[in-house]
């Protein structure tokens, strides 16, 4: 459990860094908090991954990519 928590925190920190660097470079146009955006993106990936592993047909590769791309667009280019 501790290793999982550490990995999740590291993933979050790296995602926040990427989001903030993208905003500073003018690549992203969001107004929300980068920390919150990172948690929402991670939560989406974890949820989609669970559905994918369960073999839910609606979550095959194309759908997984579509939903992730859609959320990234909504979060980072708002």
Regions found by a protein language model. Give the residues of each.
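Short secondary-structure transition hinges
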Residues: 1-16
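C-terminal peripheral helix-coil segments that are non-catalytic and often amphipathic
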Residues: 12-25, 35, 42-44, 50, ...
């Amino acid at each position: 459990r501790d290793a999982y928590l550490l990995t999740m925190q590291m993933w979050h920190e790296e995602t926040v860094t990427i989001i903030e660097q993208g905003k500073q470079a003018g690549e992203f146009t969001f107004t929300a908090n980068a920390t919150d955006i990172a948690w929402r993106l991670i939560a989406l990936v974890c949820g989609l991954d669970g559905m994918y592993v369960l073999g839910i047909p609606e979550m095959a590769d194309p759908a997984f990519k579509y939903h992730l791309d859609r959320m990234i667009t909504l979060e980072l280019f708002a």
